[in-house]
Amino acid sequence: MDYQQAGVDIEAGRSFVKTIKDNVESTYRPGVLGGLGGFGGCFEIPAGYRQPVLISGTDGVGTKLKIAHQTDQHHTVGIDLVAMCVNDILTSGAEPLFFLDYLATGKLEPEQLAQVVAGIVEGCKQSGCALLGGETAEMPGFYQAGEYDLAGFCVGIVEKSEILDGSQVQVGDVAIALPSSGVHSNGFSLVRKIIEMNQLSWDDKPAAFQGKTLGEVFLTPTQIYVQAIQGALKAKMEIHGMAHITGGGLPENLPRCLQANQSMAIDPSTWEIPTLFQWLQTMGDVPQAAMWDTFNMGVGYVVIVPAPKAAENVAWFKAQGIAAWQVGTVVAGQGEVLGLQ
């Protein structure tokens, strides 16, 4: 017996790397040293920094992958993977430099995984970061047929004096919201349960979604905010703090960019909750509090700025074609998010 008979096709793995090589290298930016295939990826720290600090992050896509498996649509989850990582490090003010991925599957299916990598490449291009390397692990007997798991890792850079860590946030500051593109990559265990409970298929087209299938709606990739936020930073917008609204929604993520003696008062009347979330709440009979605690509810990213600059900053985002609105105010408190009834 050999390794292939045991379920691991080494030649298929080599062929897969050759197939994706050009696509991966299309993400390269200044700083990348060498090419694909080495034991480690090399990246030169950009010039011009006095005290450069590297910011790292890692994340996955969660059970959203189950929808990709069940619909055989794999071209968007790679974007999700990059988005979940780069949006996180962006909150520190970091510019993403490079990205690494880990892809594990029971049996290597080249066409399927090429779709996944194409999505990762697209996410890296949207973020301006290089796909510096990755690992594709074929693990027979470990995953169900046709299924895979993903993990991503990114590294960015910021000047030490410009790190955003919440210490600059002051009572009276205003929170500016940037919209999400949908559920993003959190809350899918509840989403899938609601679909199952109502005996729906991912091919179904509820009237609420204007001709789109449930699969199309829920596989919409996570919005990447790098261009918007890096643009704001380069335009010298005075930003005191930022939050990426992921698992736990606004209640869990907003306090992460506040000081211990601060809370955030949110005004939900400042935006219309997207139809998608209203549909989920109705179909799943989900309590209002659970909706806020699980989903982003239409707010994907929050930027905290000084009150006198808030209107001007909202106008700046809109001038760049980015929807934005004033969503709340920093108040004295103990790390709570107020106003979400």
From Swiss-Prot:
Its main location: cytoplasm. It comes from the Bacteria. GO terms for molecular function: ATP binding; phosphoribosylamine-glycine ligase activity; phosphoribosylformylglycinamidine cyclo-ligase activity. Pathway: Purine metabolism; IMP biosynthesis via de novo pathway; 5-amino-1-(5-phospho-D-ribosyl)imidazole from N(2)-formyl-N(1)-(5-phospho-D-ribosyl)glycinamide: step 2/2. Transmembrane segments: none annotated. It is found in: Cytoplasm. This is Phosphoribosylformylglycinamidine cyclo-ligase. It comes from Picosynechococcus sp. (strain ATCC 27264 / PCC 7002 / PR-6) (Agmenellum quadruplicatum). The lineage of its organism: Bacteria, Bacillati, Cyanobacteriota, Cyanophyceae, Oscillatoriophycideae. The gene is purM.
